[in-house]
């Protein structure tokens, strides 16, 4: 609904074209607990023909406690390739002036260690027929030792999605641990498909 109102989506695109997130970074100044009441707002950044930034803000008790920066691209769902708004039949609205820091770009680590594998079940895929974005953080966070979560929370999360992962594919999971930072990489058949970087910060309840 939001995409239609802002001019970035229309019903004729259904099943033909869709947006996928390529990079995102989340910064939190404090943890969010179960039953916390939070408010989410969003705004669109200055876009190009193929890159569409979007920013999200998290407020709790009238205080801004978090911000998410994301980059989206429009793809042809049948060809599985990036496409232009014009090809999708879109006439985009006036380009906003908002320019902010982009999500962090992550790179493969030389000293990464293979720690596990994960076979993607059917229940993990979305309507685009690839591993749903919500599962990447779950898969990555499960590789962090339980002890790391004691008196710590994730205050910084960055994810780079490099190549789609399909149902039943086997992901080789690599971990690099540097102080309070954990970098998790997922490879399929020797090709890097995603990188997740998580920083843990100490807190007291």
Q: Predicted segment positions?
A:
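Short amphipathic
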Residues: 112-122
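A conserved acidic, glycine/proline-rich C-terminal tail/linker
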Residues: 147-176
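Extracellular and analogous surface-interaction loops
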Residues: 30, 118-120, 163
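A conserved, well-ordered hydrophobic junction motif at loop->secondary-structure transitions
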Residues: 120-142
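Hydrophobic, proline/glycine-rich low-complexity stretches
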Residues: 1-37, 144, 203-205
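Extracellular/lumenal ectodomain signal focusing on beta-strand-rich modules
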Residues: 23, 117, 156-158
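HotDog/MaoC-like acyl-thioester-processing domains
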Residues: 23, 27-28, 32-110, 165-168, ...
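Short, positively charged
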Residues: 16-17, 35-37, 54-55, 150, ...
């Amino acid at each position: 609904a939001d995409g239609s109102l802002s001019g970035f989506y229309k019903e004729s695109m259904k099943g033909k074209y869709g947006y996928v997130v390529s990079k995102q970074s989340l910064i939190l100044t404090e943890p969010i607990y179960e039953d916390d009441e939070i408010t989410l707002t969003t705004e669109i950044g200055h876009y190009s023909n193929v890159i569409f930034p979007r920013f999200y803000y998290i407020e709790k008790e009238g205080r801004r406690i978090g911000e998410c920066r994301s980059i989206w691209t429009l793809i042809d769902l049948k060809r599985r390739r990036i496409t232009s708004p014009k090809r999708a039949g879109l006439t985009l609205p006036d380009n906003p002036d908002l320019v902010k820091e982009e999500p962090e770009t992550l790179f493969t680590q030389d000293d990464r260690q293979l720690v596990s594998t994960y076979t993607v079940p059917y229940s993990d895929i979305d309507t685009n027929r690839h591993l749903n974005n919500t599962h990447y953080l779950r898969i990555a966070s499960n590789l962090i030792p339980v002890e790391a979560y004691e008196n710590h929370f994730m205050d910084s999360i960055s994810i780079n999605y490099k190549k789609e992962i399909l149902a039943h594919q086997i992901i080789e999971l690599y971990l690099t641990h540097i102080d309070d930072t954990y970098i998790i990489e997922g490879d399929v058949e020797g090709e890097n498909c995603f990188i997740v970087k998580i920083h843990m910060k100490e807190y007291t309840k």
